[in-house]
Amino acid sequence: AVADAAGLKAVIIDVESLAALSAFELIERQLPEGGKNQVLALVDAGANIMNLTVLRNGQQIYAREQVFGGGQLTQDITRHYGMTYEEAEASKRAGNLPEGYEAELLNPFMENMALEVSRALQFFFTSTQYNKVDHIILAGGCAVIPGIDEVVATRTQVNTLIANPFANMVVSDRVRAKSLLADSSSLMVACGLALRRFDPL
């Protein structure tokens, strides 16, 4: 329906979580020893859903989806400051919310996200033979929050980094490098789709 409305014809449809995994190979290359023989937890937290995918040597060994995302922070902003959802989302992205926002809303949200990541990992540990992960890689819209990697690392006691699939790519002069860097973690799915191999029709 969306493609039709845009005047486009959908030829191929992909699954969001699989598209993110396609880009994950670029992240693995940035890890010590290319992530070889390491247990890696990819946490993709978007507006409403958080996906945990655990991989070892490029193979998925666990996946879990739970309801959590940046939309909850936006809802908190709408209630706290009497904004519409659109105003709250725009203010959140622009970083022009009233004084006290960080202490009252942002920091508690970050702690809550870290707790959700920790819980998701506990589910992984109790349902597999694994009892640790070597790295947590944060992706999705929530990963652009400054300092979220440190909060998650403190809660989980696991080395945590922000996904940047473009880290080792040559960027065109027409692309705003600063904006790309700021949004890189939220572009994992888009990057994965761009890397997709197309079979001839």
Show where each model-derived region lies.
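Hydrophobic/aromatic-enriched cytosolic interaction surfaces used to assemble or bind macromolecules
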Residues: 1-201
